[in-house]
């Protein structure tokens, strides 16, 4: 299997309305897909996509 076609763990860091830093974890092919998944599964991120301040690949 091609290594580029494997899912990798990503942590999406974001800040809520009180400026508290939170995180959500997803398996995705790249950071853009991790962002898309975060927006799909997290209502706050969906409504405030600019609250994301870091997307880190954990491998």
Residue ranges of predicted features:
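A short, exposed loop/beta-hairpin motif centered on an aromatic-Gly-Thr core
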Residues: 20-33
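Short aromatic-glycine-(Arg/Gly/Cys) micro-motifs in beta-strand/loop hairpins
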Residues: 2-22
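Short, mixed-charge low-complexity intrinsically disordered segments
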Residues: 39-59
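A structural detector for beta-sheet-dominated domains
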Residues: 15, 29, 55-58
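Terminal low-complexity, poorly structured segments
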Residues: 3, 18, 33-35, 50
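Basic/aromatic-rich interaction segments and small domains that mediate binding to polyanionic partners
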Residues: 7, 33, 39-40
């Amino acid at each position: 299997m091609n290594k580029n076609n494997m899912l990798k763990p990503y942590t999406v860091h974001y800040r809520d309305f009180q400026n508290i830093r939170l995180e959500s974890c997803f398996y995705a092919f790249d950071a853009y897909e991790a962002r898309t998944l975060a927006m799909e599964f997290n209502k706050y991120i969906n409504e405030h996509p600019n609250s994301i301040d870091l997307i880190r690949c954990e491998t």
